[in-house]
Swiss-Prot record:
InterPro entries: Smim3
Annotated site, Cleavage, chain positions: 19-20
Key words, A-Z: Membrane, Transmembrane, Transmembrane helix
GO molecular function: identical protein binding
Name by which UniProt lists this protein: Small integral membrane protein 3
A biological-process GO annotation: nervous system development
Amino acid sequence: MDAISQSPVDVLLPKHILDIWAIVLIILATVVIMTSLFLCPATAVIIYRMRTHPVLNGAV
């Protein structure tokens, strides 16, 4: 009797634990975090090499 009383839309669509907007926000946050983890060490190395490069400091 339960299958008859439910609408076909409820039967076809799966129940999500989170809403769609929450899933999209989690994916975007993951992309931002992974991008910053990938780029920040490289940026730190570039800044360090620019500051300690002997030609830029005037030392021969």
